[in-house]
Design a protein with these regions (language model features):
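Short acidic-glycine-tyrosine-enriched beta hairpin
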Residues: 103-118
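A short, N-terminal "cap"/entry segment at the start of jelly-roll beta-barrel domains
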Residues: 1-64
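A generic "binding-loop/recognition-motif" signal
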Residues: 74, 85, 104, 120-121, ...
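Conserved short histidine dyad/triad with adjacent acidic residue
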Residues: 53-56, 66-83, 118
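Short beta-strand His + acidic residue motifs that chelate non-heme Fe in jelly-roll/DSBH
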Residues: 79-81, 99-100, 116, 121-128
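Short, conserved beta-strand element in jelly-roll/cupin
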Residues: 70-73, 82-99
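A short hydrophobic beta-strand segment most commonly corresponding to one strand
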Residues: 69, 89, 115, 129-142
Length: 142
């Protein structure tokens, strides 16, 4: 008989490994080279249990775009909000959860990409494993 608890442990371990690969990754373009491990995590100013790693900011991109790693603790949420004038994208790296994007519920699983145009209400809820996202904003959020 298959031991489902061991399969779940392996799934969580693999998710953590994938996230750590991003967490310790790098960004390279001709004008910018940055190691993600050198960027500190900061607490989200509004949502408890949410941390951000600002990979590229407005300062580095002339305001054109910004990239962020987002870590949402198990059972925590980024509640309903909008961005104006930013378009936001989420790439789910690891963990599980849900996103309510313009009233539509999306299962957030590794490999899912979601796009929130400017002024569209959205929220994100982490499951029991937590949730790890790569978020991008056009123009830059910060």
């Amino acid at each position: 008989m298959i031991d489902l608890s061991k399969m779940k442990e392996r799934s969580v371990d693999m998710n953590n490994e994938v996230f750590e690969a991003f967490n310790n990754g790098c960004f390279e373009v001709p004008e910018v080279e940055k190691s993600f491990k050198d960027v500190p995590w900061s607490k989200h100013p509004t949502f408890e249990g949410v941390e951000l790693k600002h990979i590229l900011t407005s300062k580095e991109t002339g305001g054109a775009y910004s990239f962020h790693l987002v870590r949402i603790a198990p059972g925590k949420s980024i509640l309903d909000h909008i961005h104006d004038p930013q378009l936001e994208t989420h790439e789910v790296i690891a963990g599980k959860g849900t996103c309510i994007n313009d009233g539509h519920e999306i299962a957030y699983l590794p490999g899912v990409i979601s796009v929130m145009p400017p002024q569209v209400h959205h929220e994100v809820h982490a499951g029991e494993e937590g949730l790890f996202l790569f978020a991008k904003f056009l123009p830059a959020l910060c």
